[in-house]
Amino acid sequence: GHSIGETYLQLASASTNVVKPLEYYQPHNLLLLEAVPGSRIAHLKNEDLTEGFSGLAQALAAFHSASIPSQLRRFRRHDPDRLRNCTRIIAMARPDVASVANKLDRELRSTIPSGQSLVCLHGDVHPKNGIALNGLVTLIDLDQSAIGPAAADLGSMLALLHYNWRIGLITRKRERELASAFLDAYAGSRQLPAQRSLSWHTAAALLSERALRSVNRIRPEGLRHLSLLLADAREILRTGGVNS
């Protein structure tokens, strides 16, 4: 809608490292964006991938420091009612994990971090939404941008890395390398959120993104590891990490 076009314009004027809108045609809700040269971070390998994660974190830190556009909605994915609905859907589809899902939901809702400062969130942070070129990363796909705590974006990425390890796409060592590169680069540009907030939003993202999408998008590997993913989220919430 028109708000998407206006939001892209405002985001592009507030941050230099996002895709630039060229034209918005309201009758057809058509938004034309500038072509972004480079490679999606998801397509990089080895050391280039590590550097891509660092660049993505730096771009995200700059995005979080930008002025918040007036049209942005509030980030709601981790609201208690949304988390409860995720749990309900997961338990309905997979009664065998209902108990651990409900325990996670209760623990999340009883430990919601307070006093989190609000920033301009990307809202859909993953390696396909960053284009790397000569050490710099441009953020794309801004349609889920919202106002919320920085830990929501960071936790989403950490949850994805954890998911990729748990289903066997990457090793535990590689998960930690990429997570460290991501967080260290962010910290080099902007103060990291408190560890408690980061752990909470990582656990919330494992529930509301990784576990839920395994169910409603029928992802076989996620479904196979669903019980472990939910247990991992509880462990991350309690201790900040998972032993392996």
PLM-predicted stretches and their roles:
Residues 2-4, 28, 95-99, 137, ...:
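Regulatory N- and C-terminal appendages and interdomain linkers associated
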Residues 27-49, 61-69, 83-94, 163, ...:
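A glycine-centered beta->alpha junction motif in the catalytic cores
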Residues 151-190, 204-221:
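Active-site activation/catalytic loop segments of kinase-like enzymes and analogous catalytic loops
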Residues 108-152:
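Active-site acidic catalytic loop and adjacent metal/ATP-binding pocket
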Residues 69-122, 188:
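An alpha-helical support segment within catalytic cores of ATP-dependent transferases
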Residues 1-27, 44-62:
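A conserved alpha-helical element in kinase catalytic cores
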